[in-house]
């Protein structure tokens, strides 16, 4: 059973996150291992396994990138274990330039410049995310997979910038 079915949701990117949360809580109550403490060893093991599956499904579907990756996996794109890389040279050059800019910001310890950088990267991420949503809605799986690969780069860059922000605030 796929994760969408487990939570009673349609297998598409745009989901009702409130319904996801309610169903998660319901499933957790239903299959919590403590409810099977007096059961057989087989029942206890099954409850632990089911609870682990529910938690994994919840973690996967609640985050936009992992939800997209999972949806793509249902359509034959295993992005989690693939060795495929982004082939868009212009995008890769832009990422290199942004990484260099972040390094410069780290050296200069310029808070205002870092704040501007984070906002810019977030805007880039949001634009790509919207592009990916449209691609998934239109079942453009190849294009969506490529966009997810690019979103991973932007997500890592955003995370690095936010870590730098925390580091600069600690001084």
From Swiss-Prot:
GO biological process, one term: [2Fe-2S] cluster assembly
Record bears the keyword ATP-binding: no
Domain annotation J: ranges: 2-74
Pfam families (alphabetical): HSCB_C (PF07743)
Gene3D superfamilies, alphabetized: DnaJ domain (1.10.287.110), HscB, C-terminal domain (1.20.1280.20)
GO molecular function, one term: ATPase activator activity
Coiled-coil region: none
Cellular component, GO, one term: iron-sulfur cluster transfer complex
Keywords assigned by UniProt, alphabetized: Chaperone
Database matches in NCBIfam families: hscB, PRK05014.1
Function comment: Co-chaperone involved in the maturation of iron-sulfur cluster-containing proteins. Seems to help targeting proteins to be folded toward HscA.
Sequence similarity: Belongs to the HscB family.
SUBUNIT field: Interacts with HscA and stimulates its ATPase activity. Interacts with IscU.
Protein name stated in the entry: Co-chaperone protein HscB
Protein encoded by which gene: hscB
């Amino acid at each position: 059973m796929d994760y969408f079915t487990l939570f009673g949701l349609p297998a598409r990117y745009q989901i009702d996150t409130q319904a996801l949360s309610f169903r998660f809580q319901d499933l957790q109550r239903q299959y919590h291992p403590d409810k099977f403490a007096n059961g057989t060893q087989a029942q206890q093991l099954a409850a632990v396994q089911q609870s682990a599956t529910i938690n994994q499904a919840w973690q996967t579907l609640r985050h936009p990138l992992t939800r997209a990756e999972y949806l793509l996996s249902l359509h034959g794109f295993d992005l989690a274990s693939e060795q495929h890389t982004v082939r868009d040279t212009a995008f890769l050059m832009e990422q290199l330039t942004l990484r260099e800019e972040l390094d410069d910001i780290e050296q200069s310890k310029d808070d205002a410049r870092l704040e501007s950088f984070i906002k810019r990267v977030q805007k880039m991420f949001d634009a790509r995310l919207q592009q990916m949503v449209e691609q998934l809605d239109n079942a453009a799986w190849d294009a969506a997979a490529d966009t997810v690969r690019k979103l991973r780069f932007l997500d890592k860059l955003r995370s690095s910038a936010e870590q730098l922000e925390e580091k600069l605030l600690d001084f």
